[in-house]
């Protein structure tokens, strides 16, 4: 047994200079671990609620109430529990909060405790977190979906699509995939400079030039890939996070690239992009509540490309179950803070995999040096991870952890590569 003996919490800063929650767990065997909670800029309406203080302090974004909840309510409830019993601990957290959206104590408070408990149990067991959570079969390193050009809510430009990603699907190892992605990133900087475009960075470390639209952004990235000597499509594919909820208005449609479009017109736009670029994945191509549009889009192009539900599913098993029943999307974006406990996150992943949906582990735009999602990606065999550009330490921390995991696995390590995207067929 690994009995929880002490629970601590504090307010720290995330990568955008906003407060977030960090939790420490001490076990009776001397184990001491900590976990920090991320926060999003573009958030889904159906996400679990972060508890913020309001008022003037930190522009209302302080988390002292969440910290107080950990110390005054959660700590007495979990002290004495066995950290190895993750599902039991998380159920205590859910019962204690007592709300469907975790708004009383806050998902940021609950998640900090949930993740710190898992880390403590792993360390007490003498196992790395990925091995503790994933067991002996955890051996697949994910494809890094590197957001090297930022728009939408992650940048102060007129680019509507939130993330333009490169996916090094042809690399033989994770180590090589990281090198390829980093080289493309630096090549993109050179391309942007040569055209007199900004090389300032967005929230997730990608460049944030003010370009005309989606096609120009993709063309710039294609030029960067060519500059490295890598092949567009077979070596490095492309992916998008549209975050369409951000420019959708119920009753009028999608205000995208200067015109208001229907779901059908957005679907036609994506279909045309597929014919012009080697895209393996599009995240949130439509709004979180446009179920009819999602079903039609999935029926139209879902056999050719991965369609990822982020705001649509918010890592919530109930919403995912609805989507599976309707035939909406074919992949789940996994963000631990959208749902608020590790157990619920793992349940969502299991449900997705059981129904043939792919999963992509993901960071948030407001990140910390916490590397839990790197271990989680390997533990659940997601085969894909989205954690920003190969720049800024809060992003690189996850990539570096995956390098360590690949080394630890040795000869048993396998890189997911193009197998992670079975719908993608490159004709180039």
Swiss-Prot record:
Residues the record lists as binding Mg(2+): 241, 283, 310
Cellular location(s): Cytoplasm; Secreted; Cell surface
Keyword Magnesium found: yes
Organism the protein comes from: Nocardia farcinica (strain IFM 10152)
Name of the featured protein: Enolase
Residues that hold (2R)-2-phosphoglycerate according to the record: 162, 335, 364-365, 386
Pfam families listed in its UniProt record: Enolase_C, Enolase_N
Any Gene Ontology CC annotation: cell surface
UniProt keyword annotations, A-Z: Cytoplasm, Glycolysis, Lyase, Magnesium, Metal-binding, Secreted
Coarse class of the protein's main subcellular location: cytoplasm
PROSITE patterns: ENOLASE (PS00164)
Described function: Catalyzes the reversible conversion of 2-phosphoglycerate (2-PG) into phosphoenolpyruvate (PEP). It is essential for the degradation of carbohydrates via glycolysis.
Cofactor note: Binds a second Mg(2+) ion via substrate during catalysis.
EC number: 4.2.1.11
Lineage of the organism: Bacteria, Bacillati, Actinomycetota, Actinomycetes, Mycobacteriales
Catalytic residues as annotated in Swiss-Prot or TrEMBL: 204 (proton donor), 335 (proton acceptor)
Biological pathway: Carbohydrate degradation; glycolysis; pyruvate from D-glyceraldehyde 3-phosphate: step 4/5
